[in-house]
Amino acid sequence: MRLFIALPVLIVVVAMTLEGPAPAQAAPDLSGTLESIPDKLKEFGNTLEDKARAAIEHIKQKEILTKTRAWFSEAFGKVKEKLKTTFS
């Protein structure tokens, strides 16, 4: 009984294996892939730009980050003034 079930299953598996990949699984055409690369790179660049702009806006709007930025600007100004007076 097991042989009657196993043999057709084995035949189906071998037939599927020898048939090759389905059209959706087949390797894509190289020229089609090369043609789509610029579009994908442009899309990636636009997405990256949007995310970077959103992150910068988010940083600008945070209160603690605004205070930190002001403190760094003030400290940099003091160091700049100190160097200016020292080397003048």
Curated annotation (Swiss-Prot):
Gene Ontology CC annotation, any one: very-low-density lipoprotein particle
Query: What keywords would UniProt list here?
Result: Lipid transport, Secreted, Signal, Transport, VLDL
What does UniProt give as the signal peptide span?
Answer: 1-26
Q: Which InterPro entries match?
A: ApoC-1_sf, ApoC-I
Instruction: Tell me where in or outside the cell this protein is found.
Output: Secreted
Please give the superkingdom of this protein's source: Eukaryota
Any transmembrane segments, and where? Answer: none
Molecular function terms, GO-annotated:
fatty acid binding; phospholipase inhibitor activity
Query: Where is this protein chiefly located?
Result: secreted
State which tissues express it.
Adult and fetal liver.
Q: Which family does it belong to?
A: Belongs to the apolipoprotein C1 family.
Q: What does this protein do?
A: Inhibitor of lipoprotein binding to the low density lipoprotein (LDL) receptor, LDL receptor-related protein, and very low density lipoprotein (VLDL) receptor. Associates with high density lipoproteins (HDL) and the triacylglycerol-rich lipoproteins in the plasma and makes up about 10% of the protein of the VLDL and 2% of that of HDL. Appears to interfere directly with fatty acid uptake and is also the major plasma inhibitor of cholesteryl ester transfer protein (CETP).
Q: What is this protein called?
A: Apolipoprotein C-I
Q: Which organism is it from?
A: Mus musculus (Mouse)
